Amino acid sequence: MKRVLIMMLDSFGIGGAEDADKFGDKGANTLGHIASHQPSLNLPHLESLGLGLAAKESCGELPKHFQNQPHLIGGYAFAREISSGKDTTSGHWEIAGVPVLFDWGLFPDKQNSFPKPLLDRIVAKAGIKGYLGNCHSSGTVILDQLGEEHMKTGLPIFYTSADSVFQIAAHEETFGLNNLYELCEIVRTELEGYNIGRVIARPFIGNKAGAFKRTGNRRDYSVEPPAKTVLQKFIEEKEGMVVSVGKIADIYAHTGISKKVKATGLEELFDKTLEEVKSAGDNTIVFTNFVNFDADFGHRRDVTGYAKGLEYFDRRLPELLRLMKDDDLLIITADHGCDPTWQGSDHTREHIPVLMYGAQVPARFLGARETFADIGQTVAKYLGVSPMEYGTAII
């Protein structure tokens, strides 16, 4: 019986998106710009799976520090996104075979971002005295700006971004983690009709500006996908096991998930992934999201941190390869870009890498994929699930 291992390097785009100009992202290239800004970038194991060549096929240029003719042990491709947005939810859903062909609701105003009637209902339902923020911001900046005031007043911090999100930051100790989660559940309910993809709980600790730190107790409250993902169909049709490591379960609104494994940070995410692969039986999908590439490095525009994170992942990749059985299929991919050299702090519209490894995967270029949904269709075919509506199987 077969297993599929999906490693989602959150935000690890490889440039080249033909519609990037529509998003203000023409020229954005997460991998390419990391490579060009680093005096050295050593990713030999990802390179052997075709990362550099996938990037070259994507944008026409081999990233710095990569070889034109590496020793290939896996198949490689790049994929275009057909979903209307460049957000986490759209990318993950499309990868699972359900592209987002509608427009998410947004809060476009930089200040006073949320409608007053919505805020009034939230305040009344939650029994809070008010709120701080109500603006666009990156998570770390707003903590420095409003964290101390939040601790003094007890008012939660509301903020958003270019994505379809309503984010709430609150101190774990002075506000309380459960209080934050309960508030997020109220907001999720009140957002009905606004078509907002996620409410995100952003707990933090610390006692003064410059010392505040977000914790690993983040929680995403997503809407459910509009159709069955390959994960759901695998469970229903094949009685399969789907193991979520990290925030995968939250992104799919806990649909199509058999087991949830919490982990924080690249090291723990990799450790937990290895544990689950070791213990997983046949007929299993292990799906891990390495969120730190996005949250810690991409949004914070930390080129060096992103590069070091990639090198850490690459160093540990052989541990995963050694655990693979003859009938296992490994897919390493991303959900969007977040170029750490780009202006602002938002995601960037880019192609994603699709790196595949397994006994049945030819070591060659596997094509320019017209949708992320080709990944979901590949998983469906490999595991004997009925075909998805979107996508073409890669192998």
Curated annotation (Swiss-Prot):
Pfam families in alphabetical order: Metalloenzyme
Enzyme class: isomerase
SUPFAM superfamilies named among the record's database cross-references: Alkaline phosphatase-like (SSF53649), DeoB insert domain-like (SSF143856)
Binding site for Mn(2+) 2: 294, 299, 347
A Gene Ontology cellular-component term: cytosol
Isomerase as UniProt keyword: yes
Gene Ontology molecular function, alphabetical: magnesium ion binding; manganese ion binding; phosphopentomutase activity
Swiss-Prot/TrEMBL GO biological process terms: 2-deoxyribose 1-phosphate catabolic process; 5-phosphoribose 1-diphosphate biosynthetic process; metabolic compound salvage; nucleotide metabolic process
Cellular localisation: Cytoplasm
EC numbers on record: 5.4.2.7
Pathway it works in: Carbohydrate degradation; 2-deoxy-D-ribose 1-phosphate degradation; D-glyceraldehyde 3-phosphate and acetaldehyde from 2-deoxy-alpha-D-ribose 1-phosphate: step 1/2
InterPro entries (alphabetical): Alkaline_phosphatase_core_sf, DeoB, Metalloenzyme, Phosphopentomutase_DeoB_cap_sf
Gene3D superfamilies given in the database record: Alkaline Phosphatase, subunit A (3.40.720.10), Phosphopentomutase (3.30.70.1250)
Residues annotated to bind Mn(2+) 1: 10, 335-336
Catalytic activity: 2-deoxy-alpha-D-ribose 1-phosphate = 2-deoxy-D-ribose 5-phosphate; alpha-D-ribose 1-phosphate = D-ribose 5-phosphate
Cofactor note as given: Binds 2 manganese ions.
Function in brief: Isomerase that catalyzes the conversion of deoxy-ribose 1-phosphate (dRib-1-P) and ribose 1-phosphate (Rib-1-P) to deoxy-ribose 5-phosphate (dRib-5-P) and ribose 5-phosphate (Rib-5-P), respectively.
Protein name: Phosphopentomutase
Source species of the chain: Actinobacillus succinogenes (strain ATCC 55618 / DSM 22257 / CCUG 43843 / 130Z)
